[in-house]
């Protein structure tokens, strides 16, 4: 039975320096991580800090599987304003360089802005801007030997539904671009029952978190209302060969957070085992 690698996003410690949490993450049994780019955690503008983070990751024998690109109100690669768009691309490319310096292989990006209620008349223009911006970013990632991965966003935002993700994927010239399925986002959009099948040919990664259906709680899988067995059955049926990254909140102390991550990892493996046993 193929075991999906299950790692942990350091985003659960986004308010804590990466230098102050990695040893605890490793001690909890996680040797594969996604790196959070929140400035208080790891400032990708500070290349001395980036280099030191890479050294520590290697010392701890951790696999830096992925790096989450920065996202904030001031970063908008779809903006009608070319100055804002250029600045946003520059920030993301800088983060991609930081990821490459650390030895990361996958660079996860929210392809749209972190703003809701954008004027409908701007939609097509913004979609075209996103395609042009992502083409530039994909080229930079290819030169850095890092794979660009697009994440489905929350339903009230651009690229919050599979149709938008598939459109932008088709508009990107590079064929070496994948998709990261965020289960929490897909559950809130109502797309989770069908999204695995729709995106299956392009799925490289899976951000796993749970919620109670009304907000993006980032609970450990199994702690919310998501029905995980159908999701895992679809992933297994379609021979998903990527990696699962637990993207849970850090609202508790480090010990409680890591206990939740360990419990979630066991939960996913137990569900997968039941699914595969039922097919024998």
Model-based region annotation:
Residues 1-7, 14-28, 103-105, 159-178, ...:
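Histidine-acidic metal/acid-base catalytic patches
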Residues 1-104, 135, 201, 262-280:
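N-terminal pre-domain/capping segments
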Residues 8-9, 39-41, 75, 79-83, ...:
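Short, contiguous strand/loop micro-motifs
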Residues 12-14, 37-39, 71-73, 113-115, ...:
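Active-site-proximal loop/turn and secondary-structure-junction residues that shape catalytic pockets
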Residues 19-20, 56-59, 78-178, 275, ...:
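Active-site acidic/histidine proton-transfer and metal-coordination neighborhood
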Residues 35, 64-69, 104-111, 146-151, ...:
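Short beta-strand segments at enzyme active-site cores
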Residues 39-41, 73-79, 115-121, 189, ...:
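A short acidic, helix-capping loop that chelates divalent metal ions and anchors anionic groups
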Residues 46-52, 85, 92, 123-134, ...:
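Charged helix-capping and loop-helix junction motifs
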